[in-house]
């Protein structure tokens, strides 16, 4: 009987211990499950809560714009000494490109007053740009009333003082242009050429992709720090090919050659935070043998999909020979916009604006496509602290 009671007691104790362990395990499992549920709940909240849109106010602004105002923002109009008040008021243009004649013989005060008058006529602040590359292309600095001497070419600047001189030059240009009221420099030149007979030879920094890339990176970063807009030009790179100002030009290099050489300075500029890319009028057979780059949808797909650039893409001047002389049935502004450009550089604003507006109103170009480009342009203006 004593043995039996002992065994019974042992069995009872074992069963009690098992029950208690089971309760403890259940309690621990409940805690783990509760923690998992809380984590899942937090994860669900994280996944479903979208970050705030930093440009929601720009979307709101676009929603209140008329179609005429939206179309106008897509145009970057050559000034060339003309009175721009009508273009600004009537066509709601997005920007004005100044040439040498717009600075020649003028004091800083006069240039400031001219640009201030343009801005006062604009409902939305204007991009005011000019080409101040240095060397053979200077618009403002060769006026002794504005600067003691014109800027040297970037390659000369480097030869005189190395990379620190290039950086100092970029800072100085930014301060100089901003002091005049200019907010965008149509630079840096990203083209690489080794042919001394090429029209780009004295404008390009180097025949070496790595050096040119470092130059572009330096200029973009310095300009960005000062809030001067930059434009990477002339995509996809002229190389040693002809001048599209006066004739058509064709590039027969392979896509791989372009990727491994000419694209590199553009990629450096994009990584540095460049605002815009200008597309040239050269025909690049390896991408699109039928159309100049500026009017080519495949070329613009390379910019967006291969280079991953989401800033403003602009045309080179649509008045240049290589596109102006084309035998096409559609207005250049419509063709260029359909190809993927956001900002259309031209002189004949009346006809090009009217053609693009008609294409939008007829449904040939969608409202969403217009809004997409207008948003890029307004974001650019916001980043330059003019909007």
Regions found by a protein language model. Give the residues of each.
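C-terminal motif of bacterial Sec signal peptides marking the signal peptidase cleavage site
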Residues: 18-22
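Short glycine-enriched loops at secondary-structure junctions
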Residues: 79-83, 130-143, 183-193, 232-238
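A substrate-binding/cap region within the structured catalytic cores of diverse enzymes
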Residues: 150-220
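Second-shell residues forming the walls of enzyme active-site clefts
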Residues: 66, 96, 104-118, 126, ...
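Bacterial signal peptide processing site
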Residues: 24-26
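N-terminal hydrophobic targeting/anchoring segments and the immediately downstream early-domain regions
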Residues: 35-128, 132-142
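Short, acidic/polar
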Residues: 78-90, 165-176, 259-268, 327-335
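Bacterial N-terminal signal peptides that target proteins for export
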Residues: 1-11
């Amino acid at each position: 009987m004593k043995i039996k009671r002992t065994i019974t007691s042992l069995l009872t104790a074992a069963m009690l211990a098992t029950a208690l362990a089971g309760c403890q395990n259940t309690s621990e499992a409940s805690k783990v499950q509760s923690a998992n549920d809380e984590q899942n709940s937090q994860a669900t909240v994280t996944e479903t809560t979208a970050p705030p849109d930093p440009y929601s106010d720009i979307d709101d602004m676009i929603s209140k714009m008329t179609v005429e105002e939206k179309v106008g923002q897509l145009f970057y109009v050559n000034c060339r000494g003309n009175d721009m008040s009508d273009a600004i008021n009537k066509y709601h243009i997005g920007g004005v490109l100044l040439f040498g004649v717009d600075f020649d013989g003028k004091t800083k005060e006069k240039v400031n007053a001219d640009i201030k008058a343009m801005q006062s006529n604009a409902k939305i602040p204007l991009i005011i740009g000019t080409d101040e590359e240095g060397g053979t292309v200077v618009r403002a600095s060769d006026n002794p009333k504005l600067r003691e001497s014109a800027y040297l070419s970037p390659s000369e600047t480097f030869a005189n003082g190395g990379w620190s001189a290039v950086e100092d030059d970029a800072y100085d240009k930014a301060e100089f242009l901003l002091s005049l009221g200019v907010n965008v420099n149509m630079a840096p030149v990203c083209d690489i050429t080794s042919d001394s007979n090429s029209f780009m030879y004295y404008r390009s920094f180097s025949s070496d992709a790595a050096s040119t890339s470092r130059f572009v990176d330096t200029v973009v970063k310095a300009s960005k720090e000062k809030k001067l807009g930059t434009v990477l030009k002339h995509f996809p790179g002229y190389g040693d090919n002809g001048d599209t100002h006066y004739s058509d030009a064709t590039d027969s290099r392979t896509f791989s050659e372009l990727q491994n050489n000419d694209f590199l300075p553009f990629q450096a500029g994009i990584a540095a935070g460049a605002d815009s890319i200008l597309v040239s009028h050269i025909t690049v057979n390896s991408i699109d043998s039928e159309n100049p780059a500026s009017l080519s949808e495949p070329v613009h797909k390379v910019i967006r999909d291969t280079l991953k650039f989401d800033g403003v893409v602009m045309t080179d001047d649509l008045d240049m020979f290589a596109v102006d002389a084309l035998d096409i049935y559609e207005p250049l502004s419509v063709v260029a916009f359909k190809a993927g450009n956001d900002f259309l550089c031209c002189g004949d604003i009346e006809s090009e604006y009217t053609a693009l507006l008609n294409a939008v109103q007829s449904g040939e170009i969608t409202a969403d496509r217009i809004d997409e480009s207008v948003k890029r342009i307004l974001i650019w203006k916001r980043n330059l602290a003019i909007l």
